[in-house]
Amino acid sequence: MASTNDLKNGLVLNLDGQLWSVVNFQHVKPGKGGAFVRTTLKNVLSGKVVDKTFNAGVKVDTANVDRREMTYLYNDGTDYVFMDPDTYDQVGVAASVVGDAADYMLENSQVVVARHDDNPLYVELPASVELDIQHTDPGVQGDRSTGGTKPATLETGAEIQVPLFLNTGDKVKVDPRDGRYLGRVSTK
């Protein structure tokens, strides 16, 4: 149990038998009436986002979520297999749990696997990942009808928009949360 005054981003709450992660919170103290906490919560399993308001100081049930850094090994067709680098235990995680993170994971990459009661909840990637461009069409000088970007296929199979000056074989930095191009990685 925790107080609503102790809420922070990333905290997982157990509300009505479902797990909700705090995405955003704001303590509000109006001129008249009691203080309250306005939150944005994301359902850990379904991804549904809702806004919920709590009175300040109310006790809420927190969930014990084990966030463990693991190494992605391989995909066996139905599950993605991860290994704990400390104990060498291997854990299979269903593709539905991994979700869009699979588009940006390479073998032997470090990820965080969150589990509750030994059930995997989600896979969290770093804020940016570096991947090679496997294929992209050459950029044509003066071609600005597309806003200066073109589609590129990464080595994982994901497709993102990149600037026209990038070519096949270049290494780029990508934000795995939304698939946004962040920059080119120097090969020096």
Swiss-Prot record:
Keywords: Cytoplasm, Elongation factor, Protein biosynthesis
Biological processes, Gene Ontology terms: peptide biosynthetic process
Pfam families: EFP, EFP_N, Elong-fact-P_C
Gene Ontology annotations for the cellular component aspect, listed alphabetically: cytoplasm
Pathway field: Protein biosynthesis; polypeptide chain elongation
Signal peptide region: none
CDD domains assigned to the protein according to its UniProt record, in alphabetical order: S1_EF-P_repeat_1, S1_EF-P_repeat_2
Record-level Gene Ontology MF annotations: translation elongation factor activity
Keyword Cytoplasm: yes
Subcellular location: Cytoplasm
Classification via PANTHER family: ELONGATION FACTOR P, ELONGATION FACTOR P (EF-P) FAMILY PROTEIN
Family stated for the protein in its record: Belongs to the elongation factor P family.
Function text: Involved in peptide bond synthesis. Stimulates efficient translation and peptide-bond synthesis on native or reconstituted 70S ribosomes in vitro. Probably functions indirectly by altering the affinity of the ribosome for aminoacyl-tRNA, thus increasing their reactivity as acceptors for peptidyl transferase.
Database matches in HAMAP family: EF_P
Protein name: Elongation factor P
